[in-house]
């Protein structure tokens, strides 16, 4: 009889998977990416990327986790004993991401409090970088811990680890059943209010107006695949880990389609809310929408506070709802990211879940303090860029090449998925994973290595954001390399006797 933890309901798994996929990037990255790559026309390559890469990869990872019944390292180990390193590489990437992702949630938590009295004032940019983050003058200087970031960071980790302490069914599932509906309701309120503001229609027109000439640009297709890839929590152990908690008779392909389209639906909702608000801001300042469009940290913590300042009424409430939505979206993702190494450490060393949460989550929480210092924003910016581009995207390419091309595991994985799923996998799935996905990811990685190694960014020194070489090497390349090296180091340690004994695994019937 299987002793592995399980989700209590199918809805619980879907909420958890969607909660992992829906994160900060849905709100602050997707709208700007869509606008810059053809507006309404971008949805053509975006949908194509979802159907030919996003959902096929979700199905692949759901099937691996469900078939081999383990964390990413254990699942790959059971697939092929020489493949354990790939799982640990993904887990190491997840660990790095959790250390700085938690800090962004802490910022959002602080700003939800600032919303009540519009504490950021009129100069929202000066407040963020000066008064709140107390950003140091030079890259590379750590500086002191910023109390306004550190205190909410402690709260974020207390909530996340407290949920993980309670386990899969009573912790992760229950939390996502509360957080995801709350997130959707809150964001619907934001969108409804935003589209009724003066200038909202101009913002939506800018967002949806198609520029079909962009479709002929290969970079637009790469942007679409990149958005899908980074948005769905693919290739850093999450979906493999979560699907290993599914009951034996679970519809894998259906769950993948629901997760993929659920995530994309929220991205579209976020785009509507963001651009309606940007349209209002543009009109109130006498500017065009193009002049106020931004993404990332600037959109969330500089532009949106400016928008909230201009609201005709209920500024504080709208601000609180917006930043509360960031907190909820961030927490559901942080929980899933942390679960990857909690599960892996527990299985590898044969320790209890609670000890794994204390060890893995506690270590991540300690490391995250680095990003709560005066130079934390710069450390975060570089680490995030390099671990995503040369961690997540690169390991995704390697995952597909190894599993599909070298080990030729698609046939047994297809048979497993088809046995328990309503939507049967056919030749389309093999073509997507065997040809389309590796070609697009390969092209994307070639471009990324080229622009970074040859220093082709439009900055004074050619580096990403113009950072000094030493800072790029230590906070960027070294972090990405650390994840890969850690992946190989963890394979040296034998699995716990309990896990080793079970590694003549029972195929899921």
Where are these regions (language model features)?
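C-terminal membrane-solvent junction of multi-pass transporters and transport-like membrane proteins
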Residues: 349, 353-361, 387-475, 505-509
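Transmembrane helix-loop junctions in multi-pass membrane proteins
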Residues: 24-33, 40, 160-171, 192-204, ...
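Hydrophobic alpha-helical segments and their helix-loop junctions in multi-pass secondary transporters
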Residues: 57, 101-126, 184-208, 278-280, ...
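Extracellular loop-to-transmembrane helix junctions
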Residues: 5, 34-60, 86, 148, ...
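Membrane-embedded translocation segments of transport machinery
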Residues: 2-7, 11, 173, 177-336, ...
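Membrane-interface "cap" regions at the ends of multi-pass membrane proteins
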Residues: 1-28, 57-62, 66-78, 85, ...
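Transmembrane helix-boundary motif of multi-pass solute transporters/channels
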Residues: 10-49, 202, 238-246, 255-257, ...
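Inter-helical loop and helix-membrane interface segments of multi-pass membrane transporters/permeases
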Residues: 2-5, 33-37, 72-85, 89, ...
